Structure formats: structure tokens, C-alpha cells
Design a protein with these regions (language model features):
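Short, low-complexity N-terminal regulatory "tails/caps" that precede and couple sensory modules
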Residues: 1-27
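Short, charged, intrinsically disordered terminal tails
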Residues: 142-144
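C-terminal catalytic core of Y-nucleophile DNA break-rejoin enzymes
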Residues: 124-127
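Conserved binding/recognition cores within well-folded domains
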Residues: 18-122
Length: 144
């Protein structure tokens, strides 16, 4: 029965495609449930990717700030780079040089202004994607 469901999703009955689908699904499930240790300025923080809403670079302090879904903010260690943050989850995308968002909370992107809207409780947040980062963000999304 399980294989029949997979056949419909994969649009074929080739066992090779079914196995590829299973391994892709397993990697996505692992990526979303995995906890990552992140060094803040005051402690070692263990977080799941879905608990992170966004990261912003503070020009004044030259530190990345990680904003959690519950609203708490953590200042990350000075050596933390955007590349390190993006490596936490495939759902993280850099929308500007100083901002990284979790695509799980992205609801839409306006075509011309590149204004982002987010799903609740972040529907009041305002963010814009830079033209430079837009292509990379689109590549991470499954666009029909």
C-alpha cells in the first residue's frame, strides 16, 4: 500500500525513482528535526531550524542576531558568518546582505517590489529581497 502511494507521487513505478523519493524525504525530515548547536555571546544554544524565524546583522556591534519564533533574540558569536547560518538548514535563505530568513514562514513575494509577507504570527513583519539575492531565493523554492 505504501509503495502504491509513492508510485502516484513519483508518477512512475520504477523502484529506482521510489528509492530516490524515499531518500529525499528522509533527508528533509532529518534536516527539519535536527538540533544544531549555535554559539551565542553568552551560551551554547541548541535549536531546531523551525524554531528560528530570521537572522539580522547588526552593523553597530558587527554581530548576527538570531530571532526565534517565540520572539527571543540571541546575539551570535562574532566569528559567525552568513554562510554558517545558511548551513543550518536548507530552508534558510539570504534575502539581503544583512538578513537571513526561514523560508518556512514566508507566505509570498510581490513580483515587482520583492516585498515579503510572512505567515502568522509574523504577518506584521516587513522585509524586502534584494535583486542580487532574489535568484538564489527562487532556486530554493519549488515554483510551479
Amino acid at each position: 500500500m505504501e509503495d502504491a502511494k509513492l508510485n502516484v507521487i513519483v508518477l512512475g513505478n520504477d523502484p529506482q525513482y521510489i528509492q530516490k523519493f524515499r531518500s529525499a524525504l528522509a533527508s528533509v525530515q532529518t534536516a527539519t528535526s535536527k538540533r544544531t548547536a549555535i554559539q551565542t555571546v553568552s551560551k551554547l544554544l541548541l535549536v531546531k531550524a523551525e524554531d528560528v524565524f530570521a537572522c539580522n546583522f547588526d552593523e553597530e556591534c558587527h554581530l548576527w542576531n538570531m530571532r526565534m519564533v517565540d520572539g527571543t533574540e540571541y546575539k551570535l558569536k562574532k566569528q559567525t558568518t552568513a554562510k554558517m547560518i545558511l548551513g543550518i538548514s536548507p530552508y534558510f535563505a539570504q534575502i539581503r546582505q544583512d538578513r537571513i530568513i526561514n523560508l518556512e514562514y514566508l507566505a509570498s513575494i510581490e513580483n515587482y517590489t520583492l516585498r515579503c509577507t510572512f505567515s502568522p504570527p509574523f504577518d506584521q513583519e516587513e522585509a524586502f529581497i534584494s535583486r542580487r539575492c532574489y535568484k538564489a531565493v527562487k532556486e530554493k523554492l519549488e515554483i510551479l
